[in-house]
């Protein structure tokens, strides 16, 4: 019996759910060779006024995990987010080719940090 089998038989949560539509996060989870489901979180990703990229990533990771956990109360849910940080300013997804080019030009010669956050929610007592 593997460690995962032992955890599976003693844990009140019956399954693991990744709260993300990111194919990259799904691929990372698949590398663990642990069975999991995927659910799309319905979360507004708009930054709040004055919110740092770090705080934005943390807030969104937790919001995604909570949103999916509300739909899957029997599961351990993993939510995550990553925000590009250019001098303390969050860089969103450009959306268009023109905006992507402008964003890349703005980043040229500067350091961009990727703030990454992971949240785990389990509602099973």
Located regions from the model:
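N-terminal G-site helix/loop of the GST-like fold
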Residues: 13-39
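Anionic-ligand binding patches
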Residues: 2-17, 30, 53-125
């Amino acid at each position: 019996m593997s460690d995962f089998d032992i955890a599976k038989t003693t844990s009140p949560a019956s399954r693991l759910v990744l709260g993300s539509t990111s194919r990259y996060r799904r691929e990372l989870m698949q590398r663990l060779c642990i069975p999991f489901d995927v659910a799309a979180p319905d979360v507004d990703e708009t930054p709040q006024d004055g919110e740092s990229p770090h705080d934005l990533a943390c807030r969104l990771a937790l919001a995604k995990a909570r949103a999916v956990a509300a739909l899957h109360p029997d599961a351990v849910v993993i939510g995550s987010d990553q925000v590009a940080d250019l001098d303390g300013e969050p860089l969103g997804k450009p959306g268009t080719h023109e905006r992507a080019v402008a964003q890349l030009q703005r980043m040229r010669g500067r350091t961009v940090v990727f703030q990454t956050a992971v949240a785990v929610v389990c509602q099973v007592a």
